[in-house]
């Protein structure tokens, strides 16, 4: 079962948000996965669709082929 990405609904799947996200009930709306304040993706963590979530000094690096992008040191 794939994790739920940022801003997508997590109704009935509160524990399935991707790493660094939590299920949050918005006022007058349904529950969505939102970033946990102060959280960032560490080196070599997958960052597909989360380019801005890498920790300081890292950037989301698109690997060749069909491999997923990862947070890598800024060169």
Swiss-Prot record:
Record key words, sorted: Disulfide bond, Ion channel impairing toxin, Pharmaceutical, Proton-gated sodium channel impairing toxin, Repeat, Secreted, Toxin
Domain repeat positions: 3-33, 40-71
Locations listed in the record: Secreted
Tissue: Expressed by the venom gland.
Main location (coarse class): secreted
GO CC terms: extracellular region
Domain comment, as recorded: The presence of a 'disulfide through disulfide knot' structurally defines this protein as a knottin. This toxin contains 2 'disulfide through disulfide knots' that are separated by a short linker.
Family to which this protein belongs: Belongs to the psalmotoxin-1 family. Double-knot toxin subfamily.
Protein name: Pi-hexatoxin-Hi1a
Organism of derivation: Hadronyche infensa (Fraser island funnel-web spider)
